Amino acid sequence: MASEKPLAAVTCTAPVNIAVIKYWGKRDEELVLPINSSLSVTLHQDQLKTTTTAVISKDFTEDRIWLNGREEDVGQPRLQACLREIRCLARKRRNSRDGDPLPSSLSCKVHVASVNNFPTAAGLASSAAGYACLAYTLARVYGVESDLSEVARRGSGSACRSLYGGFVEWQMGEQADGKDSIARQVAPESHWPELRVLILVVSAEKKLTGSTVGMRASVETSPLLRFRAESVVPARMAEMARCIRERDFPSFAQLTMKDSNQFHATCLDTFPPISYLNAISWRIIHLVHRFNAHHGDTKVAYTFDAGPNAVIFTLDDTVAEFVAAVWHGFPPGSNGDTFLKGLQVRPAPLSAELQAALAMEPTPGGVKYIIVTQVGPGPQILDDPCAHLLGPDGLPKPAA
């Protein structure tokens, strides 16, 4: 048990982000520098978030970390990189203050606990939210006020995009030291209030090929990936920023789908090939295109990260009808009451015309559940001490 009160205890939350222009591949593995810029949408923390508590105490003999209740190896290189960067920034800040003595917090060890309210390692960008939350929480506990893009990026590249709400660009940068590889907000969460995001959870299983391993293989073997980074992404970044700025949903939706498709094409172009989509993912893709064809307009878009779960973008006036289409194509088993999570959706009947246009044999249980959410803000500080995941002794609180 700790004999002294902790020097500092901070709890924060951070959001998941979903890239609409994908990041895949590093030009520098140690500094986590991407081969192309990317652009993402920050999801609302009311539905998807990571919560992290960091506690500093003179009584701690080593750094320790718990993820979703299980203690993890604090020596993991990316975790160490985040801790090292934050402590370095804290020292620089202290040294710039007219010779202030080194604060005792910098000579102390830190305990960290983090929980996700969504499946970890299932293609739901858990590492992005996790490392963004870690960087943000450590910065608060150590009194660091500088840009945290580099700290979060060293943990997980896309984590730097979770440091902001709304629509966020991760600029690839050109400098060898990565100082210009930073995240920047393109538009705030209030910019497009009608935009909705539906996550169709196909599988919460851990994927066979992790992102880090997959990226490395693609960079080494895929000529399509090199072509994409150099000749396709720059123009798409500019066009996507325009779509967001002008709230041009049909163009936004089409570009989102095309970029997702090209990302997965680079995975297939990798040798040996990588496949993150499964049969249900492909049925969702067909459902989206048939839904749009029925309406004669692009009403819905899909995107897939490195996993089989679909992320759907649409506007609020289309959500109910699209949910009805998904319900028809992938009727829930016994969990009908828990099929829809998140924002409330008004029930809507599926018209006979749309049902005929979908031309799909139902696949019961293909979609486990749907999370309905919207664009949301960046990381938040929780002021209530009851929110801390660690007790006064620096150990995880017992589950309630």
Curated annotation (Swiss-Prot):
GO cellular component: cytosol
Recorded consequence of changing residue 128 to V: In POROK7; uncertain significance
EC number: 4.1.1.33
Effect the entry attributes to changing residue 376 to R: In POROK7; uncertain significance
Positions carrying N-acetylalanine: 2
Tissues expressing the protein: Expressed in heart, skeletal muscle, lung, liver, brain, pancreas, kidney and placenta.
Pfam families from the UniProt entry: MDD_C (PF18376), MVD-like_N (PF22700)
Effect recorded for residue 228 to Q: In POROK7; uncertain significance
Source superkingdom: Eukaryota
Cellular location(s): Cytoplasm
Ranges in coiled-coil conformation: none
GO molecular function: ATP binding; diphosphomevalonate decarboxylase activity; Hsp70 protein binding; protein homodimerization activity
Residues binding (R)-5-diphosphomevalonate, per UniProt: 23-26, 78, 156-161, 212
Alphabetized InterPro entries for the sequence: GHMP_kinase_C_sf, Mev_decarb, Mev_diP_decarb, MVD-like_N, Mvd1_C, Ribosomal_Su5_D2-typ_SF, Ribsml_uS5_D2-typ_fold_subgr
Modified residues (Phosphoserine): 96
Keywords assigned by UniProt, alphabetized: Acetylation, ATP-binding, Cholesterol biosynthesis, Cholesterol metabolism, Cytoplasm, Disease variant, Lipid biosynthesis, Lipid metabolism, Lyase, Nucleotide-binding, Phosphoprotein, Steroid biosynthesis, Steroid metabolism, Sterol biosynthesis, Sterol metabolism
One Gene Ontology term from the biological process aspect of the record: isoprenoid biosynthetic process
Disease linkage: Porokeratosis 7, multiple types: A form of porokeratosis, a disorder of faulty keratinization characterized by one or more atrophic patches surrounded by a distinctive hyperkeratotic ridgelike border called the cornoid lamella. The keratotic lesions can progress to overt cutaneous neoplasms, typically squamous cell carcinomas. Multiple clinical variants of porokeratosis are recognized, including porokeratosis of Mibelli, linear porokeratosis, disseminated superficial actinic porokeratosis, palmoplantar porokeratosis, and punctate porokeratosis.
Similarity-based family: Belongs to the diphosphomevalonate decarboxylase family.
Role of this protein: Catalyzes the ATP dependent decarboxylation of (R)-5-diphosphomevalonate to form isopentenyl diphosphate (IPP). Functions in the mevalonate (MVA) pathway leading to isopentenyl diphosphate (IPP), a key precursor for the biosynthesis of isoprenoids and sterol synthesis.
Subunit: Homodimer.
Protein's recorded name: Diphosphomevalonate decarboxylase
Organism field: Homo sapiens (Human)
Underlying gene: MVD
